[in-house]
């Protein structure tokens, strides 16, 4: 199996399966001199770990990270950083009934057809369990980006199933299990999930992520565009079926006069581009939104086939998230951090000495600033 590495200069290679002894990753390319301890990583892992509320899987994993290499006396050395998270609460017997069958909507069928072998225990390599190591690696990237550039990466749930979640305040995000930016809607979300869990079904979600403080110039103009790499990274997250940058698909209904982000000496007047123009960061907030499909493993009867191609009825009795989107916010934040970290190093290597006479304008102009009207053609 190939395709387990993300990045060009800041490279992260993950390994491990849902019910194996451990999962982990190797980070290659982290600059030396970054102060780093397990505690710096653990805080992010705790935001993602399972069993934290009744609305997520009840698999109890402490997700305690071990730093095996690349750090000496609390400082990165520039050598590969190996991170390990041991699995402690596997319950493989729950999956015996799907060993010979394929769950609809899951990776079971294509995995079997591609490799001729499949670890059916918890989905094996296709399980969202693997995202824990992405969060661990992302914590390293976030720390460097924060200390070096003051970049802040934050995410929140924008929609749970049919329920949109109006943004009110970042302060509310950390105070509820949904990462919802609106405290008033949390009881409604809880009631919805309680009924969903009783029904045995699952539901999707929409997650928004914002990176503030990203300098102008990161990204390449053709194949390695910053927005292309962000979309690639987000689409690699389990269950993600769509990604938007900035206005995204709403751009279809906009006019050019509405979509184009005008510039003034005081700053940009809007951010429909989501902080990326021509594949290169503009200095505005990088805005990303992703759609997550409903969990494929559900307790309801579904039609499928077995290995011989015979029709069967499948239902799954393991411990699963009825909505994987509930724990996806830290994962999305981590993936954005990894992409930004990689492009930061690439930009520094190629264009770190470039200077222009044009001043960098503010990400958003102060309220009330208007663009100078275009001169009328005679």
Swiss-Prot record:
| The protein's Enzyme Commission number | 4.2.3.5
What reaction gets catalysed by this protein? 5-O-(1-carboxyvinyl)-3-phosphoshikimate = chorismate + phosphate
Q: Which GO terms describe its cellular component?
A: cytosol
User: Which GO terms fall under biological process for this protein?
Assistant: amino acid biosynthetic process; aromatic amino acid family biosynthetic process; chorismate biosynthetic process
| Cofactor list | FMNH2
InterPro entries of this UniProt entry? Answer: Chorismate_synth (IPR000453), Chorismate_synth_AroC_sf (IPR035904), Chorismate_synthase_CS (IPR020541)
According to the UniProt entry, its GO molecular function terms are: chorismate synthase activity; FMN binding
Record: residues binding NADP(+): 48, 54
Pathway of this protein? Metabolic intermediate biosynthesis; chorismate biosynthesis; chorismate from D-erythrose 4-phosphate and phosphoenolpyruvate: step 7/7
The alphabetical list of record keywords is: Amino-acid biosynthesis, Aromatic amino acid biosynthesis, FAD, Flavoprotein, FMN, Lyase, NADP
Entry cofactor note text? Reduced FMN (FMNH(2)).
Binding residues for FMN: 125-127, 238-239, 278, 293-297, 319
UniProt similarity note: Belongs to the chorismate synthase family.
Function of the molecule: This reaction introduces a second double bond into the aromatic ring system.
Please describe the quaternary structure of this protein. Answer: Homotetramer.
The protein here is known as Chorismate synthase
Source species of the chain:
Azoarcus sp. (strain BH72)
